[in-house]
């Protein structure tokens, strides 16, 4: 049985050719100019179509190099939320030496006003955070805080260095990576009193009701949360690591600081002084003795301050010390502890 034939039905041409109306060449010599979005006859130059879509694959950027082969992307880099302006500036190619010089000159001429100061501050914040091994999230938070201050023209009359120091200190507390005022002072070369004044002013602005509390953040998710003061337990890990003390000493020193806080043995003393004196006592008790001078070099607390705080701990040693902390369980506590 033969299958039905469809030869009698009309057919349509599914292949449509675009031929130049002037030269009528077949096959046509068509050129797609993606840079202008036009379809042009390669023989006579007649434009046959416009607004064509570039279907070629787009390049992705894996390099920050300024060389000609460094960034093949044609759409530019992503906008930086920490900078002002639209950041849609025209740039000059740096293909050769002359182009590189022109690119630098053009970049300086079109730079958004005030952006240079922000970039300088961000560079300093990044370098300072790297110097004391702070994670990137702390540096980003400090930069965001600095931008909020700059946008609202807050803290007028204060030096940029003192503002940077205060921003890093607040960022450390927000990120649960505490650093002392003395460490920030040594890092930034800003007097401790100046950092303290700027920090208190900035903290008031960031808390509820302050000038910066309801401002729109440059980085979403970085809301300011007022934190409590740094405790001695928070400082133990870093100080003990720098003194090459084992984990057992860290845990015992942190517990000693907690007990001293509950009993009020060192009431009124700074957390760093409590941490230093606790390390001095526990390191000797557990067989890893450190001198006040060694502890002073790490913590920044003077020898005399460590000895005075230790004297108060020594007076209540029986209530504060757990017998299992003694290196030689059968040993005498008083024989192992240094005399106050």
From Swiss-Prot:
CDD domains: CYCLIN_TFIIB_rpt1, CYCLIN_TFIIB_rpt2
Pfam families in the cross-refs: TFIIB (PF00382), Zn_Ribbon_TF (PF08271)
InterPro entries, per the entry: Cyclin-like_dom, Cyclin-like_sf, TFIIB, TFIIB_CS, TFIIB_cyclin, Znf_TFIIB
Zinc fingers classed as TFIIB-type: ranges: 16-49
Location in the cell: Nucleus
Sequence repeat residue intervals: 128-204, 239-315
Gene Ontology cellular component list: nucleus; transcription preinitiation complex
SUPFAM superfamilies associated with the record: Cyclin-like, Zinc beta-ribbon
Alphabetized UniProt keyword annotations: Metal-binding, Nucleus, Repeat, Transcription, Transcription regulation, Zinc, Zinc-finger
Residues the record lists as binding Zn(2+): 20, 23, 41, 44
Broad class of where this protein is predominantly found: nucleus
Signal peptide extent: none
PROSITE patterns, per the entry: TFIIB, ZF_TFIIB
Protein's UniProt keywords contain NADP: no
Molecular function (Gene Ontology), one example: zinc ion binding
Superkingdom in the source lineage: Eukaryota
GO biological process, one term: transcription initiation at RNA polymerase II promoter
Oligomer and partners: Associates with TFIID-IIA (DA complex) to form TFIID-IIA-IIB (DAB-complex) which is then recognized by polymerase II.
Family from the record: Belongs to the TFIIB family.
Biological role: General factor that plays a major role in the activation of eukaryotic genes transcribed by RNA polymerase II.
PANTHER family: TRANSCRIPTION INITIATION FACTOR IIB (PTHR11618:SF13), TRANSCRIPTION INITIATION FACTOR IIB-RELATED (PTHR11618)
Entry protein name: Transcription initiation factor IIB
């Amino acid at each position: 049985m033969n299958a039905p034939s469809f030869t009698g039905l009309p057919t349509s041409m599914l292949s449509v050719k675009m031929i130049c109306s002037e030269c009528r060449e077949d096959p046509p010599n068509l050129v797609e100019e993606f840079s202008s979005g036009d379809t042009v006859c390669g023989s006579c130059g007649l434009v046959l179509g416009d607004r064509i879509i570039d279907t070629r694959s787009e390049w992705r950027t894996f390099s920050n190099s300024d060389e000609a082969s460094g960034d093949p992307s044609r759409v530019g880099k992503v906008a930086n939320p920490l900078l002002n302006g639209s950041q849609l500036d025209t740039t000059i190619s740096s293909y050769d030496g002359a182009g590189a010089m022109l690119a630098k000159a053009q970049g300086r001429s079109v730079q958004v006003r005030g952006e240079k100061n922000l970039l300088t501050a961000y560079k300093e914040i990044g370098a300072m955070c790297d110097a004391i091994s702070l994670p990137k999230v702390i540096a980003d938070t400090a930069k965001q805080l600095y931008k909020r201050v700059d946008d609202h023209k807050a803290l007028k009359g204060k030096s940029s260095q003192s503002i940077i120091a205060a921003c890093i200190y607040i960022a450390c507390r927000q990120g649960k990576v505490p650093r002392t005022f003395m460490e920030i002072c040594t890092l930034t070369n800003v007097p401790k009193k100046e950092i303290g004044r700027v920090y208190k002013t900035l903290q008031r602005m960031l808390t509820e009701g302050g000038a910066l509390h309801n401002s729109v953040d440059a980085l979403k998710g970085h809301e300011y949360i007022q934190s409590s003061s740094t405790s001695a337990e928070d400082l133990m890990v870093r100080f003990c690591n720098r003194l090459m003390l084992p984990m057992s000493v860290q845990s015992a020193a942190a517990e000693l600081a907690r007990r001293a806080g509950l009993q009020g043995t060192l009431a009124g003393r700074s957390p760093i002084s409590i941490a230093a004196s606790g390390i001095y006592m526990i390191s000797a008790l557990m067989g890893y003795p450190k001198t006040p001078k060694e502890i002073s070099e790490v913590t920044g607390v003077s020898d005399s301050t460590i000895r005075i705080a230790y004297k108060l701990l020594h007076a209540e040693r029986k209530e504060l010390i757990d017998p299992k902390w003694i290196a030689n369980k059968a040993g005498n506590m008083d024989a192992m502890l240094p005399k106050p």
